Design a protein with these regions (language model features):
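N-terminal pre-domain/capping segments
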Residues: 1-87, 91, 162, 251-260
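Histidine-acidic metal/acid-base catalytic patches
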Residues: 2, 9-21, 148-165, 170-260
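Short glycine-centered, acidic/aromatic-flanked micro-motifs in structured strand/loop junctions
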Residues: 7, 32-34, 102, 138-140, ...
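Active-site acidic/histidine proton-transfer and metal-coordination neighborhood
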Residues: 11-14, 50-53, 69-162, 172, ...
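Acidic (Asp/Glu)-rich catalytic clusters
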Residues: 17-24, 39-60, 85-94, 123-131, ...
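Conserved beta-strand positions in the central sheet of alpha/beta enzyme cores
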Residues: 29, 59-60, 99, 137, ...
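A short, flexible beta-alpha/helix-coil linker loop
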Residues: 33-35, 65-67, 104-108, 170, ...
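Short, solvent-exposed loop/turn segments at secondary-structure boundaries
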Residues: 39-42, 70-75, 109-114, 174-177, ...
Length: 260
């Protein structure tokens, strides 16, 4: 298992990478968002050099708000083009995978449209990623009841698509127990994990184990994840301005994983 963290897209990416390298992380979850990480303006050479300097791995994360499943065909095409730009950067910095978010559309359409429009964009993107030696990963979104079935159909339609499980999003979507349901259903396709804490009301990106007793049993959750056979990359999405909380979460995760 490898532990990483996500850069703040408002900050200089090289400085972010250096901080993660200096504090003992295994990889960087490189988010490709404006303002500082717009794919059209990334200094790929500097990013690669910083990663190499600290022997850090990298996974890429496209902007979560790109509307891959918009009801408007022109927006879906524009979304695909944005993902393709991000994919090129991901390949150039040495990423093995790039995350794309499941995207909300207005509840005016039948469920098959959710699946159809995602597949329309993800299928060619996965093909292009394969040519570059990368895998596209689909991440569950926060607070979208029913998406688990849509994601199942999308994964079935695109065998080369991987799954990215965000624990905070599952808590907002359906409570504490939904994380285990996702692991059970998609464990064979699971290629990346995000961990963070919240109180179930929204995606707060709090430090692990920061909620009162009776919320998430983190040692048990990590045991179930490890028992599923997963042994890959885990990003800590702890977005406190005081990064001591990120380091504390990292140390807790190492402790729980070793004990699992």
């Amino acid at each position: 298992m490898k532990i990483g963290a996500m850069n703040d897209p408002r900050r200089d990416p090289v400085a972010e990478i250096e901080w993660f390298g200096q504090h003992g992380f295994d990889f960087v979850d490189l988010t490709l968002d404006p303002p500082a990480m717009d794919p059209s303006n990334v200094d790929v050479k500097s990013v690669r050099a910083a990663l190499a300097r600290y022997s850090l791995g990298v996974v890429a994360h496209a902007a979560w708000y790109i509307p891959i499943s918009s009801p408007f065909p022109s927006l879906r095409q524009a979304a695909l083009q944005e993902f393709q730009r991000a994919l090129k950067v991901a390949a150039h910095v040495g990423a093995q995978g790039m995350t794309v978010h499941y995207f909300r559309i207005p509840p005016l359409f039948p469920p098959e449209r959710y699946v159809e429009w995602h597949v329309e964009g993800l299928r060619p993107l996965c093909s292009q990623a394969g040519d570059l030696g990368l895998t596209i990963l689909l991440e569950n979104a926060p607070g979208l009841p029913g998406q688990i079935d849509h994601i199942a159909h999308i994964l079935e339609a695109i065998p080369s698509l991987g799954f990215h499980l965000d624990s905070g999003h599952t808590h907002v979507e359906g409570g504490v127990g939904l994380f285990d349901v996702y692991v059970e259903r998609f464990g064979r396709r699971l290629m990346h994990v995000h961990l963070s804490e919240n109180d179930g009301s929204y995606d707060q990106h709090l430090p692990l184990n920061s909620m009162p007793v009776g919320q998430i049993d983190w040692p048990a959750r990590i045991r179930r994840l490890k028992a599923s056979g997963y042994d890959g990359t885990i990003s800590l999405e702890v977005f406190s301005p005081d990064r001591a909380y990120l380091l504390q979460s990292r140390d807790l995760l190492r402790q729980w994983w070793a004990a699992a």
